[in-house]
């Protein structure tokens, strides 16, 4: 019989992202404090574009977006954004949704498993995910608890537990 294993991934449901952006756009259209600010939120691929006529309004739109992400169960660790940039008469803020585990983060996770994990547990980097194998399921459970206690700045999900 094959050794027990599980995969560590960092994926965000695209439908939930779409729903959160649509809810944000709807709230922006109906809220009184966003009237006549030209505020909008649009999704295109892996990025979300937030637009408003002042720097503060763009940050307020970002707050609404983050609130909707939390309500839909999406980790804010999956979002990356910088400061709003002026563009003509409006300010734009691009928010990127990160999918998958970056190579440097994957190496840090594998190193943590080797250093602090139970003996006999191995982690292999497979593209944008990690496969963790071990002799006993109890060891794999300990690895999951170890990784949940750490902050790797990406949302981690544990799938394909066999």
From Swiss-Prot:
The keyword Nucleotide-binding applies. It holds the Pfam family DUF520. CDD domains: YajQ_like. It comes from the Bacteria. GO terms for molecular function: nucleotide binding. Nucleotide-binding protein. NCBIfam families: PRK05412.1. PANTHER family: UPF0234 PROTEIN YAJQ. This is Nucleotide-binding protein FRAAL1054. It comes from Frankia alni (strain DSM 45986 / CECT 9034 / ACN14a).
